[in-house]
Structure formats: structure tokens, C-alpha cells
């Protein structure tokens, strides 16, 4: 069982004595910076020259510096930029300013676990990862609640790495809900597996195949969209609220019986075998190498996939149907704007 830490286990004063730099001001970056500031922490934001986020950060009352300047000033540096850009930014702008005793933090372990970022031995290296999108991290904090999170220590040079991580987690509100202790290896490998096999890759492929089967059988694309994509949220929300048992309790007997008797025919032993293969590719570093080389080449494979998927009929049908749903437009605008609340 995982060890879980709460507010009582975290000393926020430990962080208030230090200067914190948030590198990046996207979904997570804006939430971390604002929550830490509101918790009484000395925060600055490090952004690339010409960043479109500068005006938003300054508009929120935050001090904005270059990545190098922020890293030089800070004792605690949280890296919240995309995985594929972290190595270059780290090597050129953060590493030169990592003096002894500083703490380097990440919200995802990819670049540490797969040895793309190599911190010096005299700094703390740790992970603090809220298990929710940035706008939710911010809103829950503002409402006096918090998002569950993860904490992990890769390198404890000062003897205080975990304490710093817990203080940071408290500063952004995660210890209000509970923070689970993990490792960089576990966070990275399970996160990638979940994305590829279930949450993104698996779910998207299942939805698209279901849509195609119905359309190919002569049903209206609009009906196929509603049944295979739109209503997925209704089911996932039930799982989210109470697990599989609550979902099955909440649906019709017809749907429940079909779940038990037909679901395993769609996602069967062969699917599980492929999941095992995907996990081995992650554990062995094969996916990481493939992704790194893809980005070094300029992302040609990603570009082809994006173009092909954007042209799939489900996208055009979905756009037309979503235009009928005012609540979706409002929710999308709200969640995409860091300053919306």
C-alpha cells in the first residue's frame, strides 16, 4: 500500500524560506505559480524570450524573468515545460545555475528516468505531480480543497529532499487531499502505460473503431458519434465517481448484461498481451528512444498522424454536433484559459 501524506506531514515554512522558480506558465505552471504565491511563497516565473505567456503571468501579478535568470535566483526550481524541450532548456539555461544545495523538481519523471537530464550530485532532485489538470489544481485550491498528488525523491543531496517536496505539495494544495509517495520509475512507466494503452491510445482507438463499424453498417454518422464518443463521458464520470461497481449500478440492466457478456470479446486476452508488450517497450526504454529520435528529426511521424486523424470523419461530425451544445463551448473556454478564474 502507498504511503500517503497530508497537511500535518508537510512544513510549508521550509519552502517559505526559499526562492522558488516555476519554469513555464502553461496548464500546470500557472496553477503552481499562483497557488504558491497565495500560500506565501516567494515565486518567480521563468519563460523563454518572446513567450506569449509573459503577459498572462505579469497580468496575474507574477514576476517574470528569463529561464536562466529565474534559475539563478531560485533555490527551488520546478520544471513545467514539455518533455521534449526539457533537455535543451535544462542544459543551456538551468544547469549552469544549479549550485550546491538547490532543489530541482519535475511534475513528470520522463527526462530523469530516461537519463536525458543529468543533474549534478550535490542538488536535490524530486517529483511533485498533481493528479489533475492545472485549472482544477487552481480551482480546488481557491475553494479551500486540493487535488491528490504524487511525491518522489530521485536524489537527496541535502537530507531534506522529501521535506521540500512535501512543502511544495502543500503550497499548491495537494496535501489537503493527500500525496502518495512513489518513485520516478513508477510514476514515469505507469503514466506512459496509462496514456498509451488505456486513456489516450486505447480509448481513442476503441471509440474510432466503434464509430467506423456503425457507419460502415449504414447507420447515420451522427448516431454513431453519440453512441461511441459523446456518451463515453457519461460512463467515465460514473467510473470516476465510484469505480466500475458504481457505473454498473447506475446503468440499465440491459447495458450491464451487455458489459459482462460482450465487453471481454472486444478487449480480450490478445489486447492484454499487446498491453504487456507496450509496457515492456516502456520499461526497456524503447518508447523513450523512439520519441526522442522523433523529436530530434523534427516530428515527421507525429505530423503525419495528426494530419490523418484530423481528417477522420468523426472529427467533422463531432464539430457539428458539439456546436449544438452550449455547455461544451463554455466548459472548453473556461478550461483553456489559465486566467479564467
Swiss-Prot record:
Which enzyme type, at the first EC level?
A: oxidoreductase
Metal-binding listed as a keyword: yes
Might you give the EC number(s) for this enzyme? 1.1.1.86
Indicate the segments forming the KARI N-terminal Rossmann domain, all copies.
Answer: 1-182
Q: GO cellular component terms?
A: cytosol
Catalytic activity entry:
(2R)-2,3-dihydroxy-3-methylbutanoate + NADP(+) = (2S)-2-acetolactate + NADPH + H(+); (2R,3R)-2,3-dihydroxy-3-methylpentanoate + NADP(+) = (S)-2-ethyl-2-hydroxy-3-oxobutanoate + NADPH + H(+)
Enumerate the residues binding Mg(2+) 2: 191, 227, 231
Q: List positions binding NADP(+).
A: 25-28, 51, 53, 83-86, 134
The family database entries (InterPro entries) matched by this protein are listed as:
6-PGluconate_DH-like_C_sf, KARI, KARI_C, KARI_N, KARI_prok, NAD(P)-bd_dom_sf
Q: Which UniProt keywords apply?
A: Amino-acid biosynthesis, Branched-chain amino acid biosynthesis, Magnesium, Metal-binding, NADP, Oxidoreductase
Pathway the protein takes part in: Amino-acid biosynthesis; L-isoleucine biosynthesis; L-isoleucine from 2-oxobutanoate: step 2/4; Amino-acid biosynthesis; L-valine biosynthesis; L-valine from pyruvate: step 2/4
Residue ranges annotated for the KARI C-terminal knotted domain, each copy included: 183-328
Q: Which family does it belong to?
A: Belongs to the ketol-acid reductoisomerase family.
Protein name in the entry: Ketol-acid reductoisomerase (NADP(+))
Gene that specifies this protein? ilvC
Amino acid at each position: 500500500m502507498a504511503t500517503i501524506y497530508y497537511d500535518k506531514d508537510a512544513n510549508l515554512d521550509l519552502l517559505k524560506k526559499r526562492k522558488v522558480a516555476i519554469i513555464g506558465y502553461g496548464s500546470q505552471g500557472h496553477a503552481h505559480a499562483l497557488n504558491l504565491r497565495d500560500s506565501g511563497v516567494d515565486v518567480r516565473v521563468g519563460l523563454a524570450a518572446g513567450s506569449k505567456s509573459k503577459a498572462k503571468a505579469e497580468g496575474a501579478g507574477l514576476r517574470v524573468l528569463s529561464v536562466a535568470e529565474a534559475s539563478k535566483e531560485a533555490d527551488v526550481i520546478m520544471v513545467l515545460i514539455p518533455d521534449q524541450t526539457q533537455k535543451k532548456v535544462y542544459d543551456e539555461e538551468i544547469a549552469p545555475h544549479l549550485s550546491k544545495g538547490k532543489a530541482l523538481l519535475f511534475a513528470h519523471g520522463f527526462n530523469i528516468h530516461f537519463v536525458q537530464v543529468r543533474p549534478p550530485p550535490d542538488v536535490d532532485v524530486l517529483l511533485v505531480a498533481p493528479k489533475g489538470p492545472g485549472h482544477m489544481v487552481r480551482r480546488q485550491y481557491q475553494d479551500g480543497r486540493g487535488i491528490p498528488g504524487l511525491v518522489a525523491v530521485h536524489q537527496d543531496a541535502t537530507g531534506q529532499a522529501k521535506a521540500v517536496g512535501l512543502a511544495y505539495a502543500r503550497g499548491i494544495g495537494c496535501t489537503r487531499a493527500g500525496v502518495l509517495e512513489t518513485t520516478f520509475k513508477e510514476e514515469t512507466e505507469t503514466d506512459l502505460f496509462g496514456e498509451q494503452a488505456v486513456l489516450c491510445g486505447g480509448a481513442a482507438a476503441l471509440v474510432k473503431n466503434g464509430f467506423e463499424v456503425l457507419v460502415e453498417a449504414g447507420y447515420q454518422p451522427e448516431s454513431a458519434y453519440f453512441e461511441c464518443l459523446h456518451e463515453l463521458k457519461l460512463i467515465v464520470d460514473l467510473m470516476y465517481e465510484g469505480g466500475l461497481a458504481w457505473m454498473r449500478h447506475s446503468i440499465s440492466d440491459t447495458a450491464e448484461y451487455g458489459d459482462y457478456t460482450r465487453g471481454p470479446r472486444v478487449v480480450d486476452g490478445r489486447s492484454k498481451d499487446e498491453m504487456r508488450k507496450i509496457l515492456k517497450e516502456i520499461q526497456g526504454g524503447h518508447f523513450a528512444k523512439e520519441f526522442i529520435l522523433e523529436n530530434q528529426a523534427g516530428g515527421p511521424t507525429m505530423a503525419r498522424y495528426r494530419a490523418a486523424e484530423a481528417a477522420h470523419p468523426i472529427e467533422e461530425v463531432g464539430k457539428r454536433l458539439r456546436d449544438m451544445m452550449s455547455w461544451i463551448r463554455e466548459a472548453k473556454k473556461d478550461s483553456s484559459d489559465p486566467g479564467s478564474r
